[in-house]
């Protein structure tokens, strides 16, 4: 809200020319109370700062265009040095002298522009090395390569075990599973989405086939799963490459003309042991954000403790999400061991110490306990990780009860998501 209420804006950025326009949206106040700092970042890490730019003399409701040759030169240099990296330009308007309730140097307004787009990895790229070893039994297919062991259950269709250098990456008896449901937010309850989308809480999984084959120096396991409750089918493909990279493909096929509710999420979820207590990600942060609530959070490189990722809303609900994520690492701060998730397009990711069921009050927000608060929650001794292609927005188009705008919803149709899992050490 503060972002869209700000009164100073950047427009018409031409990074290669170091050119931009400042718009003073104030109705009665000239721009003399603020100065402008500019930062240039490469893959979210600051590499250049041009501070204290004088923007005096811009009248209310007026614009002024600036050209900074030094800025243009630095941007061109960084782009040439980092041809596949994302180069962004951050603009910060800061209080020049301070005033009541505002400190000198405090940020009053901000804006981010992309000078060079991110180059996403090619997920299917070939790697060198020996083909994985494979063990098959009546109940599972196990693949091993470069210290990574992946076990796909024939009865579940999921990755039931994931070990790296002999260390278990998943909580015992918990699998890497699809993620379609979220703990309803206050706005969800207002629109009764917890009832309207309820079928996605238990889609009704039934494995119809599991097969596997060698493809070059990789090995591929395919699981086909019926989802009768939502009249769809899920095809899961797990590829273990020679270097230990796991490629996960999640393909949902909807039944044409079927009348099925929209979904909250599309992606995967897993539970990691509690020692994996930190995250490092390149995406929007550091504050949680959602598809229709993310403009104020800049794309950058961030680190955080998992324990701090749940925001204590008055009552428990979905929390901790980050959008436009390029890479997401969950790791043990002591050893650096953990998992790195990447995709070929932006993801939405989170890692908190609560399961969705801990935050979900059911069909009524008073279903579990009248007046339940976030302070009543007890963190679990695990890290719940969500790796998503999509999650619907938070809505609140009116004060309460409206659905998210159409572009921030997930109607019933086909969806596909691919991402990789790599060991961090």
PLM segments and residue spans:
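Carbohydrate-binding surfaces of carbohydrate-active enzymes
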Residues: 1-154
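Beta-strand/loop-rich accessory regions of lumenal/periplasmic or secreted enzymes
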Residues: 73, 77, 82, 118-425
């Amino acid at each position: 809200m503060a972002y869209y209420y700000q009164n100073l804006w950047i427009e018409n950025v031409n990074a290669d020319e170091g050119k931009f326009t400042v718009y003073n949206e104030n109705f009665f106040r000239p721009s003399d109370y603020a100065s402008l700092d500019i930062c240039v970042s490469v893959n979210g890490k600051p590499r250049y700062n041009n501070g204290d730019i004088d923007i005096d003399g811009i009248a209310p409701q007026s614009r002024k265009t600036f050209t900074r040759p030094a800025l243009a030169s630095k941007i061109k240099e960084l782009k040439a040095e980092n041809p596949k990296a994302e180069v962004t330009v951050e603009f910060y308007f800061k209080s020049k002298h301070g005033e009541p309730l505002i400190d000198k140097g405090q940020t009053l307004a901000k804006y981010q522009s992309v000078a060079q787009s991110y180059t996403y990895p090619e997920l299917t790229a070939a790697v060198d090395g020996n083909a994985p070893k494979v063990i098959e039994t009546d109940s599972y297919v196990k693949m091993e390569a470069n210290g990574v062991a992946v076990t796909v259950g024939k009865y579940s269709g999921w990755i039931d075990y994931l070990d790296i250098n002999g260390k278990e990456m998943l909580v015992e008896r918990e699998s890497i599973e699809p993620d379609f449901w979220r703990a309803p937010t206050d706005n969800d309850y207002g629109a009764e989405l917890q009832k309207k989308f309820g079928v996605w809480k238990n889609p009704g999984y039934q494995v119809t086939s599991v097969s596997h084959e060698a493809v070059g120096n990789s090995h591929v396991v395919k699981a086909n799963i019926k989802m009768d409750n939502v009249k769809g089918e899920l095809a899961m493909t797990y590829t273990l490459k020679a270097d230990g990279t796991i490629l996960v493909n999640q393909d949902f096929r909807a039944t044409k003309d079927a009348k099925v509710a929209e979904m909250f999420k599309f992606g995967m979820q897993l539970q990691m042991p509690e020692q994996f207590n930190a995250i490092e990600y390149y995406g929007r942060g550091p504050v949680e954000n959602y598809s229709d609530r993310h403009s104020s959070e800049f794309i950058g490189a961030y680190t955080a403790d998992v324990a701090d990722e749940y925001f204590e809303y008055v009552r428990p609900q979905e929390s901790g999400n980050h959008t436009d994520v390029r890479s997401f690492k969950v790791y043990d701060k002591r050893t650096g061991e953990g998992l790195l998730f990447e995709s070929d397009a932006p993801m939405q990711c989170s890692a908190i110490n609560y399961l969705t069921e801990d935050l979900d009050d059911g069909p009524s927000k008073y279903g579990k306990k009248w007046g339940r608060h976030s302070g009543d929650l007890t963190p679990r001794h695990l890290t719940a990780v969500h790796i998503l292609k999509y999650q619907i927005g938070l809505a609140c188009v009116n004060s309460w009860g409206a659905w998210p705008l159409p572009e921030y919803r997930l109607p019933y149709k086909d969806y596909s998501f691919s991402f990789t899992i790599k060991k961090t050490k």
